[in-house]
């Protein structure tokens, strides 16, 4: 495999630093990925040479910034194969995107007695907004359970759907188990029953190509900071026909057509009616640079490289006798585990002393922890800049902890 890993690693400045006197092994990209120099430079260039408020001025700087921002909207649409740039809404991240759908689509189209379906593997961001909506409206939440291997049984979905069911919210890739759900098949079954489908793609877009039209989903959400882009910027894709029917969630500048103290307010068309206030313009520019970066490398080569690395990591970790792995064999991005009876926090703290960064805790997936009957897990996540040497350092660190703690 000819993936240019040395060049890729050189593109990420932070990977060259040391932590606790050790070369950094960064295995926490599922929480937030490191940034290539191209993304850092893009934001710096915008702030230094081109900053201005967008959509609010006739002067050259404002016009240039507006044009660049809208160009990124088109770029995002192309990246996920949306039908139109007007189906792309800039938000702060995945969490805000799901809240926007829950509070705009949900409060407009759902009513007491309706039901929605979520899965047992969802991130809290795809649980709590629906719980809040259900509590306010009297909507029932139905939970699609997992199999023993941490996967969804497709045939179990039909039993959850009846005449009251309106919406399915499902992750494409589990942020804990790495389970890659068969979204196209899931969406087809849900759409055949008349459901609207929201797909959480936060853990998918950096690992594999995404085509929202081929998937058939109504909404698709993801964050920039996990895609090697800046923090504070994310995307909500929504089918145009739905977005045009949805009321604004937040009010303010930029999302209006007219405002009158006597005749009320009329709102801009989608997507702008959902973008109240001043946007994170620099973050949008950085997101565009991040998409350029992964597109230039190619998502298929990235996927192939990461899958090879994942298979190697699972094979090496499986040799540690006291280590418990969670999730299916075929997965993307993340490896959840526990080491004997040792608390995940202790394992993570020891690894940090060896310069190895992993994530520990419930990973914003407490229902999943309850499913496995554990309070917490360790999670190592792989990205396009990780290597077999990183995996070997992790394995050696865990073996050292095993000997130290018994």
From Swiss-Prot:
Q: Per its Swiss-Prot or TrEMBL entry, what cofactor is needed?
A: pyridoxal 5'-phosphate
One Gene Ontology MF term: cysteine desulfurase activity
What does the entry list under GO cellular component? cytoplasm
Which cell locations does it reside in?
Cytoplasm
Which residues carry out catalysis? 364 (cysteine persulfide intermediate)
Q: Where, per the database record, does this protein carry N6-(pyridoxal phosphate)lysine? A: 226
Predominant location category: cytoplasm
For this UniProt entry, which residues form the secretion signal? none
Q: Which PROSITE patterns match?
A: AA_TRANSFER_CLASS_5 (PS00595)
Reaction catalysed by this chain? (sulfur carrier)-H + L-cysteine = (sulfur carrier)-SH + L-alanine; L-selenocysteine + AH2 = hydrogenselenide + L-alanine + A + H(+)
Look up the domain of life of the source. Bacteria
What EC number(s) does its UniProt record assign? 2.8.1.7, 4.4.1.16
Pathway involvement of the protein, from the record? Cofactor biosynthesis; iron-sulfur cluster biosynthesis
Keywords linked to the UniProt accession: Cytoplasm, Lyase, Pyridoxal phosphate, Transferase
GO biological process terms on file? cysteine metabolic process
Q: Which Pfam families match?
A: Aminotran_5 (PF00266)
State the disulfide connectivity: none
User: What NCBIfam families would the database entry show?
Assistant: PRK09295.1 (NF006791), sufS (TIGR01979)
Q: Which family does it belong to?
A: Belongs to the class-V pyridoxal-phosphate-dependent aminotransferase family. Csd subfamily.
Q: What this chain does, per the record?
A: Cysteine desulfurases mobilize the sulfur from L-cysteine to yield L-alanine, an essential step in sulfur metabolism for biosynthesis of a variety of sulfur-containing biomolecules. Component of the suf operon, which is activated and required under specific conditions such as oxidative stress and iron limitation. Acts as a potent selenocysteine lyase in vitro, that mobilizes selenium from L-selenocysteine. Selenocysteine lyase activity is however unsure in vivo.
The record's note on quaternary structure and interaction partners says: Homodimer. Interacts with SufE and the SufBCD complex composed of SufB, SufC and SufD. The interaction with SufE is required to mediate the direct transfer of the sulfur atom from the S-sulfanylcysteine.
Tell me what this protein is called.
Cysteine desulfurase
Organism of origin: Yersinia pestis
């Amino acid at each position: 495999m000819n993936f240019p890993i040395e060049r890729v690693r050189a593109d990420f400045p932070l990977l060259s630093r040391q932590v606790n006197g050790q070369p950094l092994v960064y295995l926490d990209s599922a929480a937030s990925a490191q940034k290539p120099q191209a993304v850092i430079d893009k934001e710096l260039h915008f702030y230094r040479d081109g900053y201005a408020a967008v959509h609010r001025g006739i002067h050259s700087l404002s016009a240039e910034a507006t044009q660049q921002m809208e160009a990124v909207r088109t770029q995002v649409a192309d990246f996920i194969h949306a039908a139109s740039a007007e189906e792309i809404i800039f938000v702060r991240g995945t969490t805000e995107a799901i809240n926007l759908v829950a509070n705009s689509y949900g409060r407009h189209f759902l009513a007491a007695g309706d039901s929605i379906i979520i899965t047992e593997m969802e991130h809290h961001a795809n649980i709590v907004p629906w719980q809040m909506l259900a509590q306010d409206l009297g909507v029932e939440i139905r939970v699609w359970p997992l199999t023993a291997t941490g996967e969804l049984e497709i045939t179990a979905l039909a039993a959850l759907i009846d005449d009251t069911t309106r919406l399915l919210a499902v992750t494409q890739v589990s942020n804990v188990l790495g389970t890659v759900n068969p979204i196209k098949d899931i969406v087809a079954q849900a759409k055949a029953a008349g459901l609207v489908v929201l797909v959480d793609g936060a853990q998918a877009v950096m690992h594999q190509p995404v085509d929202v039209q081929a998937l058939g989903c109504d909404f698709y959400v993801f964050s920039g900071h996990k895609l090697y882009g800046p923090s504070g910027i994310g995307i909500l894709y929504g089918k145009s026909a739905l977005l045009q029917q949805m009321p604004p969630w937040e009010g303010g500048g930029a999302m209006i057509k007219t405002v009158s103290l006597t005749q009320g307010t009329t709102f801009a068309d989608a997507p702008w009616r959902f973008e109240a206030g001043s946007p994170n313009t620099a973050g949008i520019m950085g997101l565009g640079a991040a998409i350029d970066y992964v597109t230039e490398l190619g998502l298929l080569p990235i996927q192939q490289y990461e899958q090879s690395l994942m298979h190697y990591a699972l094979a090496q970790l499986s040799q540690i006798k006291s280590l418990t792995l969670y999730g299916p064999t075929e997965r993307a991005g993340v490896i959840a585990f526990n080491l004997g009876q040792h608390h995940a926090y202790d394992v993570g703290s020891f690894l940090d002393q060896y310069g190895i960064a992993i994530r520990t805790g419930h990973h914003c997936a407490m229902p999943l922890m309850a499913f496995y009957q554990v309070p917490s897990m360790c999670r190592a996540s792989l990205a396009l800049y990780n290597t077999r040497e990183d995996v070997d350092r992790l394995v050696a660190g865990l073996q050292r902890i095993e000997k130290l703690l018994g």
